[in-house]
UniProtKB/Swiss-Prot annotation:
This is Biotin synthase. Binds 1 [4Fe-4S] cluster. The cluster is coordinated with 3 cysteines and an exchangeable S-adenosyl-L-methionine. Binds 1 [2Fe-2S] cluster. The cluster is coordinated with 3 cysteines and 1 arginine. It catalyses: (4R,5S)-dethiobiotin + (sulfur carrier)-SH + 2 reduced [2Fe-2S]-[ferredoxin] + 2 S-adenosyl-L-methionine = (sulfur carrier)-H + biotin + 2 5'-deoxyadenosine + 2 L-methionine + 2 oxidized [2Fe-2S]-[ferredoxin]. Disulfide bonds: none annotated. It is an enzyme of class 2 (transferase). Catalyzes the conversion of dethiobiotin (DTB) to biotin by the insertion of a sulfur atom into dethiobiotin via a radical-based mechanism. It comes from the Bacteria. [2Fe-2S] cluster binds at C103, C134, C194, R266. GO terms for biological process: biotin biosynthetic process. Pathway: Cofactor biosynthesis; biotin biosynthesis; biotin from 7,8-diaminononanoate: step 2/2. Its EC number is 2.8.1.6. GO terms for molecular function: 2 iron, 2 sulfur cluster binding; 4 iron, 4 sulfur cluster binding; biotin synthase activity; iron ion binding. [4Fe-4S] cluster binds at C59, C63, C66.
Amino acid sequence: MSASTTATTRHDWSLAEVKALFQLPFNDLLFQAQTVHRAHFDPNRVQVSTLLSIKTGACPEDCKYCPQSGHYNTGLEKQKLMEVQKVLEEAARAKAIGSTRFCMGAAWKHPSAKDMPYVLEMVKGVKAMGLETCMTLGKLDQDQTQALAQAGLDYYNHNLDTSPEFYGSIITTRTYSERLQTLAYVRDAGMKICSGGILGMGESLDDRAGLLIQLANLPEHPESVPINMLVKVAGTPLAEEEDVDPFDFIRMLAVARLLMPKSHVRLSAGREQMNEQMQALAFMAGANSIFYGEKLLTTANPQADKDMQLFARLGIKPEAREEHADEVHQAAIEQALVEQRSSELFYNAASA
């Protein structure tokens, strides 16, 4: 099974085709992914974004991976919606350290009418700084989507998380079709889409393939496809799940690159548990977007200077804003604070 390196994109992938890609010899898969990547991107440029949690904890959703859910006791401090001025100060700091995207994430099922005016002011203020804006606020209705677009929001993150078949085992408070509807509203409003999923929740290979099929078979591919590795947090139902095999994670990135050749594939939550060698393999597999800074919502993220040191060693440079208009920021799945252990490839956050 091989993937085309032409500019043609497909929206009719089958499960058998995608599983065949996953089952390729590792070197062959990476070669194909890197070849496709080079046909559409500079292989030595990686887009960087900063993420800020503007409202933390007490979410009414029951996502089993998430410490921000009000259904679980994870010890995460609940916080109200951040003041607009504070958000703008954080955005200015993000711009100063080199970010070109600023994403604001709120732990909501959906934004309320009373919060929307503040959210819209955040978008306008960040946009005025010359940063590209993105948000993840949960489910949106059509009016909210239009309001965000009119305020200048560039990108909206709404993950599918996993396959339709496995989804009900992870979340019961929001349906898969509701997620797809929000994505449709976002696209109709003229904004760009960031949507991906999580590995390590107990899903099968069919589920991993099924997630990518859902994304690749959308009428338009998401501009950004975040691939998250579960960060296991004590108190959540998935705290004792087995670690993801690092080669399986790299395979997921590579297949995402083959199915969605023009999308930015984001190395997302879980990067804290990856050593430099694994991150280098991720870039070889076609990942070309990361978070930059100290925190990823409620999960620790490698320090910014450490990221830049790795970039220098690999000959990678941050992607400048003007070099592309089709990147989206991903508000990676909310997880709890995890200490950095750079000497280990993975470690169980539940033991911290």
